[in-house]
Regions:
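Single-stranded RNA-binding regions, centering on S1/OB-family and related RNA-binding modules
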Residues: 1-178
Length: 178
């Protein structure tokens, strides 16, 4: 949707812009017009983008064919670019962990896909599901998940995911000698 930040990989660079593939959307391509590559005048587009490069772009509009998007590179701040890339990397990592789990517990492709979709819907992101399980192991069963995959899921989460915040309780004494 318009204004969304998406992950794109440059497929082809032309004089007037760059064609990109969208990792998260199968069958939809993007185009970054030369005027949306960078602020200011772009003399050589290849100095800014090259094939195979991963970019974070802002969706400007959906073209009439509904199969391609017009994107902007210049309207994404460095901070937002970094945050979105970190989010994408975390999600890729979570997919890898779920692959490990699927193999471990013997899920079929259909089960694997179904759990991936369900967990993503329940926790907004797949990474969010792992993060929540690492922080609060009972979070999965509390919202109705059950099965022999829960414990290995929690173990993978605890081993591989570092939560944003950790609560530490205890007594702390500090002596200062003058």
């Amino acid at each position: 949707s318009e204004g969304e930040l998406i992950v794109a990989v440059v497929r082809e660079v032309k004089q007037n812009g760059a064609y990109v593939d969208l990792d998260e959307y199968e069958g939809i391509e993007g185009f970054i017009f030369i005027g949306e590559i960078a602020s200011g005048w772009v003399k050589n587009i290849r100095a800014f983008v090259r094939p195979g490069q991963r970019l974070i772009c802002k969706v400007m509009r959906t073209r009439k064919d509904n199969k391609s998007l017009e994107l902007s590179l210049k309207s994404v701040s460095e901070e937002r670019r970094r945050d979105r890339l970190a989010q994408w990397k975390n999600e890729e990592r979570a997919k890898q962990l779920l692959n490990v789990l699927a193999e471990q517990v013997g899920w079929t492709k259909e089960e694997h896909l179904e759990y991936q979709t369900d967990l993503t819907e329940s926790f907004l992101t797949l990474y969010g599901a792992f993060e929540e399980a690492a922080k609060t192991p009972e979070s999965l069963t509390e919202i109705g998940y059950e099965g022999d995959w829960i414990q290995p899921f929690i173990e993978l989460a605890v081993k591989n995911i570092i939560p944003d915040t950790v609560e530490i309780r205890g007594r702390f004494t500090l002596n200062v000698d003058q």
